[in-house]
């Protein structure tokens, strides 16, 4: 073995998707400076999947469209190496860190894999239950209800003990799941120090329900928001995947006095609000952690049981440590799991400051464009 081969740095491919997933993977990679880290939008190598991708039918999914454009822009801005579909650098990777296990290509299944929970999973529908009974792939549930439940990855990093139990109950081996917390949702107190110019309002954070092939009565939702707000200022923050022109038009029609933000840091807006209204959005967990009164299409009491652990922002370091130990482990996956114990650090919101190596997704970090 040559000297160059002996000391060659190991390579890790981070699979990204939404803005939140992209920034989470960046934070984890930043904790692994001794490895060559590359990034790729989630992709398919199957001929049928590639054909569907070319038709444009996946434009509103994390495979393509605005999600991929934003991810590519983020990678370029932060000078991260983009190896989309392993087609640019063509490396043989030692490990893949996954943002989803709903779809994992065959070649990635042949190497070590670590799955990281992004945030909230979608509700389990009747069709989702039937798809599982029929033995269909998890993505056939047509939402993210089974993300983290395919049992495909070698290791799973969960946001909380509540989510760990959910993943286990839906199919993932208990010994694979580690409660690490998840970046962006592990230190809500950090968002209290912000430059958002408004305070004391009711914030409504929308979801991309219609854009992901589901139905929604948006006018009814807007009217509910107006009723909850009462005499207080109502602010809408639109989901980044929404049809913004349509959403803005609807809000102006049914809540003419509301302010509308299509961009900006949602977490900062939550930190300054009095009350938070959500649909199917993970940001509800920021409101819960900060003690806000929250509304959600999910049962709020159940959400409190699932809420991500608050560990002062060390989730990325904990996940990176797990990756480091696993990639360097020379035994089998089963041997690694037998020798590794789950370690979760949960501390008070105000006890510890977040690491300086924190990367929150925004095209204009800390900058808030005028409300529409």
Could you describe each region identified by the protein language model?
Residues 7-18, 204:
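Nucleotide-activated donor-dependent transferases that construct or modify glycoconjugates
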Residues 13-187, 284:
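Active-site and donor-binding regions of nucleotide-sugar-utilizing enzymes
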Residues 24-25, 31, 183-250:
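Conserved catalytic-core segment of nucleotide-activated headgroup transferases in glycan assembly
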Residues 35, 54-61, 109-116, 251-260, ...:
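Active-site regions of enzymes building and remodeling cell-envelope glycoconjugates
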Residues 89-90, 104-110, 167-171, 196, ...:
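Short loop/helix-cap segments at secondary-structure boundaries that form the rim of catalytic
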Residues 153, 306-372:
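Leloir-type glycosyltransferase catalytic cores
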Residues 263-308:
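A donor-sugar binding/catalytic signature common to diverse glycosyltransferases
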């Amino acid at each position: 073995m040559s000297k160059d081969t002996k000391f060659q740095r190991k390579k890790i491919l981070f699979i990204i998707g939404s803005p939140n997933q992209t920034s989470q993977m960046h934070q984890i990679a930043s904790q692994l400076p001794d490895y060559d880290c590359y990034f790729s939008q989630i992709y398919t190598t199957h001929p049928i999947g590639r054909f569907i991708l070319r038709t444009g039918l996946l434009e509103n999914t994390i495979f393509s469209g605005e999600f991929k454009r934003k991810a590519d822009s983020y990678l370029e801005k932060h000078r991260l190496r983009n190896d989309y579909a392993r087609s640019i650098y063509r490396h043989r990777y030692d490990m893949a860190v996954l943002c989803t296990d709903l779809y994992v290509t065959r070649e990635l299944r042949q190497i070590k894999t670590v799955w990281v929970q992004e945030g909230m999973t979608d509700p389990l529908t009747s069709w989702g239950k039937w798809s599982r009974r029929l033995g269909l792939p998890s993505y056939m549930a047509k939402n993210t209800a089974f993300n983290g439940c395919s049992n495909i990855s070698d290791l799973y990093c969960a946001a909380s003990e509540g989510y760990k139990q959910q993943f286990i109950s839906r199919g993932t081996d208990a010994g694979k799941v580690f409660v690490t917390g998840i970046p962006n949702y592990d230190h809500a107190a950090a968002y209290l120090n912000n430059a958002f110019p408004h305070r004391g309002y009711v914030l409504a954070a929308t979801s991309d329900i219609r854009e992901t092939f589901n139905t929604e009565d948006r006018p009814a939702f807007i009217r509910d928001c107006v009723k909850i707000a009462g005499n207080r200022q109502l602010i809408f923050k639109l989901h980044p995947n929404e049809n913004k022109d349509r959403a803005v038009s609807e809000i102006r029609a049914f809540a003419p006095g509301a302010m509308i933000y299509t961009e900006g840091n949602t977490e900062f807006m939550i930190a300054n609000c009095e009350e938070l209204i959500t649909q199917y959005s993970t940001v509800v967990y920021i409101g819960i952690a900060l003690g806000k009164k929250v509304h959600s299409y999910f049962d709020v009491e159940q959400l409190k049981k699932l809420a991500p652990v608050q560990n002062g922002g060390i989730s990325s370091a904990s996940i990176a440590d797990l990756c480091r130990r696993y990639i360097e482990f020379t035994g089998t996956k089963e041997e690694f799991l037998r020798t590794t114990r789950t370690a979760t650090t949960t501390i008070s919101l105000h006890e510890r400051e977040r690491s300086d190596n924190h990367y929150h997704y925004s095209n204009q970090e800390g900058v808030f464009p005028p409300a529409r």
